[in-house]
């Protein structure tokens, strides 16, 4: 089994999926992954569908130079956002795969959330483009490795009601003692 970037605290309650050497932009895919990190699986899938329909956008926080602004970024507190369709489709495929793996393990699909998602750079694929005056420039693509882990949410245990301990200052203690002496 391949090694993941994060180890699950409870492997019996989590499922994983990964894709290697995927021909999809590393920068766009990284921003897409960060947008859904920590989200519930159903919410993340619905959000990515809305991104494909241009109803919502992916916020670009790190790789955002020379990116246009859109009002759809306000939802996330940013001005720069995009709709990277190819990256969204690859991430959707991995989410679907992780959901199927979780179902095979017998996990409850309604309780799943994205506990870990990581995008790494794969080796560049090199080509060449021919320029004026007999020059040649490199023409590289930036593929990605994507890994994600979905985990079943655990039931939150309510804390026991703690007894409220009233702390009195020395002045308050003295006043109470004086009142007891007067009334006694």
Swiss-Prot record:
Q: Which InterPro entries match?
A: Ribosomal_uL22 (IPR001063), Ribosomal_uL22_CS (IPR018260), Ribosomal_uL22_euk/arc (IPR005721), Ribosomal_uL22_sf (IPR036394)
Q: What is its main location?
A: cytoplasm
* GO CC term (a single one): cytosolic large ribosomal subunit
The covalently linked position for Glycyl lysine isopeptide (Lys-Gly) (interchain with G-Cter in ubiquitin), per the record, is: 46
The alphabetized UniProt keywords are: Cytoplasm, Isopeptide bond, Phosphoprotein, Ribonucleoprotein, Ribosomal protein, Ubl conjugation
**Highest taxon in the source lineage:** Eukaryota
Lyase as a keyword?
A: no
Additional information: Present with 21100 molecules/cell in log phase SD medium. There are 2 genes for uL22 in yeast.
Q: What function does the entry list?
A: Component of the ribosome, a large ribonucleoprotein complex responsible for the synthesis of proteins in the cell. The small ribosomal subunit (SSU) binds messenger RNAs (mRNAs) and translates the encoded message by selecting cognate aminoacyl-transfer RNA (tRNA) molecules. The large subunit (LSU) contains the ribosomal catalytic site termed the peptidyl transferase center (PTC), which catalyzes the formation of peptide bonds, thereby polymerizing the amino acids delivered by tRNAs into a polypeptide chain.
Tell me the subunit arrangement: Component of the large ribosomal subunit (LSU). Mature yeast ribosomes consist of a small (40S) and a large (60S) subunit. The 40S small subunit contains 1 molecule of ribosomal RNA (18S rRNA) and 33 different proteins (encoded by 57 genes). The large 60S subunit contains 3 rRNA molecules (25S, 5.8S and 5S rRNA) and 46 different proteins (encoded by 81 genes). uL22 is associated with the polypeptide exit tunnel.
Q: What is this protein called?
A: Large ribosomal subunit protein uL22B
Q: What is the lineage of its organism?
A: Eukaryota, Fungi, Dikarya, Ascomycota, Saccharomycotina
Gene name? RPL17B
């Amino acid at each position: 089994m391949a090694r993941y970037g994060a180890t699950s605290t409870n492997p019996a309650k989590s499922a994983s999926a990964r894709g290697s050497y995927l021909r999809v932009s590393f920068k766009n895919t990284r921003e897409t992954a960060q947008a859904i990190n920590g989200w519930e699986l159903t919410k993340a899938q619905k959000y990515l569908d809305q991104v494909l329909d241009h109803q919502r956008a992916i916020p670009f926080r790190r790789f955002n130079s020379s990116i246009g602004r859109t009002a759809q970024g306000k939802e996330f507190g940013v001005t720069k956002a995009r709709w990277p369709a190819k990256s969204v489709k690859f991430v959707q495929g991995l989410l679907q795969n992780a959901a199927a793996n979780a179902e095979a393990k017998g996990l409850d699909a309604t309780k799943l959330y994205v506990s870990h998602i990581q995008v790494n750079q794969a080796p560049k694929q090199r080509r060449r483009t021919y320029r004026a005056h007999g020059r040649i420039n490199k023409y590289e693509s930036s593929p990605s490795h994507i890994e994600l882990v979905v985990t079943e949410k655990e039931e939150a245990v309510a804390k026991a009601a703690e007894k409220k301990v009233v702390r009195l200052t020395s002045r308050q203690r003295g006043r109470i003692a004086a009142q007891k002496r007067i009334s006694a």
